[in-house]
């Protein structure tokens, strides 16, 4: 069984959501139903790969210990970086070992679970979380089945607030109706539209540069329908359970600049990076007076932030280049916004917005082409044909 794949999963999901709907209509909590199904799903998904199941359980236990230790430490300022490093260490090992042709002990969803765990640890340090989560709440948050494999990346405080929120029957029915719509739309995106696009992407790599251009457009459409489809299904299932899991996409292809794009694409990832990487790098640089100008600080922070995002996807050349590429785009646009008189004069004009949109979309699609790894394959084929 796989998350949001196959008849067996959707039949089981349908049964659980029907029970959840009935319970919510009668204003009964679905907390334990959701927790039970999340644990059961982990068992059925990983039962054929016991090494991954053991690794996942080990990660959950390690995370709980780190959370408890962080809450009890007196000098958190010195120890917090160590706790964050320990929380991220399994993911680092999983990402790095394949570079040396060694199989790691990774498991489905480790990247997303790591960010959830790091969020808890940092927010305990920031005293936004006053006391550590209970065993059940912690396990439920980490293993919440709709978002386990590919997000969206929720925050623990928001997640737990949803379970404690008292909704009227009318409020729940409105949320459930939205959830059903999102679930059906996500199914259509992922099973129909992404499948249709994928059929046109399976041809052999051709040496003509027009092949790469065509592939760039196709891959962009495929990536959106596949990933947005999964995210919609995850959010829709969450809504029917009574959880308002945050949306991951907000019409990204109407973005008029690269910052606007990252406010609309993979939103829970970009906001996580903004809150826990970018803003903290900026604060540290300003506190240490690393750079004289705030603009330089912001530009360097964007480079670090997006390069980190590339490594999070994987320690391979295409992912790293993708991260650096978006770091350059974000840093360059930051400079352009702050320094360009042309931008300040024309930014609100219709012709400028249309031109900016067209340029932004092609820069974004070029990034997706890099992300796909196809340019490296194309270059290697050209070299082999010499």
Regions of interest found by a model, annotated:
Residues 1-386:
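Membrane-embedded transmembrane alpha-helical bundles that form the catalytic cores
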């Amino acid at each position: 069984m796989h998350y949001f794949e196959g008849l067996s999963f959707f039949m089981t999901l349908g049964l659980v959501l029907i029970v959840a709907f009935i319970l919510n209509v009668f204003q009964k909590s679905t907390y334990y139903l959701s927790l039970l199904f999340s644990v059961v799903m982990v068992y059925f998904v990983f039962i054929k790969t016991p090494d991954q199941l053991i690794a996942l359980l080990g990660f959950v236990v390690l995370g709980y210990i780190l959370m408890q230790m962080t809450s009890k430490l007196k000098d958190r300022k010195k120890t917090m970086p160590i706790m964050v490093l320990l929380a991220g260490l399994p993911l680092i090992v999983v990402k790095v070992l394949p570079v040396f042709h060694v199989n790691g002990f990774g498991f489905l969803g480790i990247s997303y679970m790591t960010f959830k765990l790091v969020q808890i640890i940092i927010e305990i340090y920031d005293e936004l979380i006053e006391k550590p989560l209970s065993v059940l709440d912690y396990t439920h948050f980490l293993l919440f089945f709709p978002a386990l494999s590919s997000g969206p990346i929720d925050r623990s405080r928001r997640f737990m607030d949803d379970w404690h929120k008292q909704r009227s029957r009318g409020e729940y029915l409105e949320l459930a109706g939205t959830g059903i719509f999102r679930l059906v739309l996500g199914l259509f995106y992922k099973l129909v539209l992404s499948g249709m696009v994928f059929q046109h992407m399976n041809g052999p790599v051709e040496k003509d540069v027009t092949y790469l251009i065509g592939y760039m457009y196709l891959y962009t459409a495929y990536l959106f329908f596949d990933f947005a489809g999964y995210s919609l299904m995850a959010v829709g299932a969450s809504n029917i359970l009574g959880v308002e899991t945050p949306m991951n996409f907000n019409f990204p292809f109407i973005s008029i600049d690269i910052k606007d794009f990252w406010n609309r694409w993979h939103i829970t990832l970009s906001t996580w990076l903004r809150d826990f990487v970018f803003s903290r790098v900026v604060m540290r640089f300003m506190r240490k007076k690393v750079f004289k100008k705030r603009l330089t600080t912001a530009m360097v922070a964007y480079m670090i932030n997006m390069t980190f995002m590339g490594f999070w996807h994987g320690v391979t050349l295409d992912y790293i280049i993708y991260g650096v590429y978006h770091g350059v785009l974000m840093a360059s646009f930051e400079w352009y916004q702050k320094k360009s008189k042309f931008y300040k004069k024309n930014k609100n004009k219709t012709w400028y917005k249309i031109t900016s949109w067209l340029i932004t979309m092609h820069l974004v699609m070029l990034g997706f082409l890099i992300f796909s790894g196809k340019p490296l394959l194309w270059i290697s084929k050209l070299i082999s044909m010499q």
